[in-house]
Every structure is written in structure tokens, then in C-alpha cells.
Amino acid sequence: MREIELKYGCNPNQKPSKVYMENGNNLPIEVLNGRPGYINLLDALNGWQLVSELKKATGLPAATSFKHVSPAGAAVGTKLTDIEKKIYWVEDLGELSPLANAYARARGADRMSSFGDFISLSDVCDVDTAKLVKREVSDGIIAPGYTDEALEILKAKKGGNYAVIKVDPDYVPDAIEKKQVFGVTFEQGHNFIEIDNDMFKNIVTDNKDLPESALIDLKIALITLKYTQSNSVCYVKGGAAIGIGAGQQSRIHCTRLAGSKADNWFLRQSPQVLNLPFLDSIKRPDRDNAIDLYIGEDYMDVLADGKWQNIFKEKPAVFTAEEKKAWLAKNTDVALGSDAFFPFGDNIERAYRSGVKYVAQPGGSVRDDNVIEAANSHNMVMAFTGLRLFHH
């Protein structure tokens, strides 16, 4: 397949549109079903790079959930806890394959943002993963292959129009990449940098105890950031990104945004949320919306008289600010990555409130001393990588 003709570009008025190889070679992808769009393919190609690098760095199957050219979640395939099964809506599926676990966690980190996602998988899509994808609202999927049964399940999705893409896992892009803006061609070297253990050796804090589990989480954070629109910050725990702040002009707003997402992920594990008495007829996306409102400042949108009766069997108690603060204090050992240096210690202070213990950032700010002092005040472990990871 040398080119794919698209319905339109970013917007319906941007026609004609297609993707192709400038050198005339075949594309490294094959469309097995559906008709992916321009943004779908941007998500697919960025997401594939992310999961293939996660697999290489950790040795575990990996998945990511992309929306508008940034990941909403990314994870490796470790076993789900019973609570994770509940908050990801998969407790009825029994034991899942490692790849399905990876997608459940990638999708479940920020379910509001992942609605209508494009999925990338590091490994051949199996039946467990296909059954999980079948239940979710999603635009498409890319993987290095599909079992016959998994492919049939996916082909039936969206009335037979679900986009299914197979990628050549051995494809390596040219060393030089190009893109055009306003008719002007930009050229740069492809970002082949690998995130490995050596990148975290320069620990600048008093506490230098970096366990293997935290090292893996920091690698996941930086690999995720490598394919996230800048500025970006990523919180990771237990092999999964739990809060990604993408595309913000200020570093502190990245840290706040990602931190609020990480907080929401942890609040969903609280007894107050796990025991919400949903009506049996409430669908998965509506539950996600209700939970998002319930744990936020607009909780009366679901608890007001005339509202809660449409969602719950009985009216839940308000999840008070004091209760939320007490629950969030239990979230610990979170890892944090940043695609560029923290200019002020306020980023560290905000990260600490979301349970951050381990930090990886390039360093190089004129106020590095202030940032290190803030990290030391909370007994954090912080590595300076010397590596900026801007992505646009």
C-alpha cells in the first residue's frame, strides 16, 4: 500500500487529503478495516512509537490511549488489583491477558479524556484485548497483528466501520524527518533517543534511594512525554500513567493539570466512589461522567433533587473536601516526569500534594537550587536527566 486517500484533513473543509511515503516505498501500515482519518493516523503513528518503546524499555506488553495527538493514558501489562478492576469496569471479565491489562489501565487512567480514543498496542491483539475494546467508545486501533478471532470482534465494532490498522513492527523511519507549515518545509533528525537506566544516574537530592519499581515508572513517564504535545508533565504509579498534562504554555499549569488527573484517578478508588449506588440501566460513559462530577466541585450537578434520581438508586452523601483530602493523603510513591526543567519549586510543592516521591526532569534552570531544596524538604528522590523531550 503506497498511499491512503483520506476523506479530509484536520477539518472537513481541508481537501484533498492523503498519506504516503515521499520516497515512493510502501507505507509501514495496512488498513484492515474501516477508514481512519487524518487525526486518527497521527494518533496511531505517535501511539505506536510510544508503546513499542515502552515494551523495549520494560519487557512488558504496553498500550496507550490517544486523543488529539497526545496520550490520555499509557501503561504496561502488570496484573490488575481487585480495586483497579472495579474502577476500570472490567471486574466481570475474569483474569485478563497482560496486553488487555495494559489497555484497561491505559484507558482507565483518564476515562473522560479517553472517550473516543485511538488505541495503540505493542503486541499482537488477542481476544481478551479485543473484547475489552469492543465495550469502549473508540475510533480505532493499531497493532503489529491480530489473532483471527480478535480481528473479527474488532471488525464488527461501529457497525463494521471501526478502523483497524496493522503496523510493520520492523519498520524504522529515515534519520531525517520533514513537515510543512505555511508552505515552509521544516527538517530535523528523528528523535531516536532511548530512555534507559543510565538516564537516571544523576540523582541531585539528598535521598538517592531509587527502587526498581520507581525506575520503571520514571521510564514510563519520560517515554510517555516523548510523544505528548509540549509542555507536558506525567504522573506514573505502578506501571501506568495516572495523570498527563499536555500542551500547556506554563510548566506549573502542566503540573497542576496532570496532578488533578492523578488525584481523580485515586479518588475513584475511595469507598465513597466504589460504593456509589448506580441504577442498573446507567451505561459506562454516563457512570464516568457522574463520577467526574461527584468527585469535583460541581457535585450538585448529580446530587441535586431531580438529578440524582436519574443516576442513583438512592442519594449518595456529599464527598466532602475534608474526606477527599484525607483519602488523597494515602496516595504515595508516585513518580513524576517533566519534558523540560522545572523553573520554580512550586512545581515540586504541587506534585507532593499528589503523592509524588520520585522525579525525573532535565535540570538546567537558573533556580535548580530552589527546586532541589523543595524536593529535599519532602525527602523526594530527583534525577536530572539532561534530556529535553519537547514534542510538536
List PLM regions with ranges.
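Active-site loops and adjacent core secondary-structure elements that bind or stabilize anionic groups
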Residues: M1-M199, A214-S232
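Gly-rich Lys/Arg/Thr-decorated short loops/hinges at beta-loop-alpha junctions or inter-strand turns
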Residues: N23-R35, A109-F115, G189-K208, D286-K307, ...
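Alpha-helix N-cap/helix-initiation motif
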Residues: P36, N40, G247, A340, ...
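Conserved helix-loop functional segments at active or binding sites
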Residues: E53, Y227, N264-R268, R353, ...
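Flexible, glycine/charged-enriched surface loops at secondary-structure junctions
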Residues: A57-S65, V164-V167, S230-K237, L267-L279, ...
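Active-site-proximal loop/turn and secondary-structure-junction residues that shape catalytic pockets
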Residues: S70, C125, K237-A240, F342, ...
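Glycine- and Gly-Pro-enriched alpha-helical subdomains that act as flexible
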Residues: A72-R111, I242-F341, G345
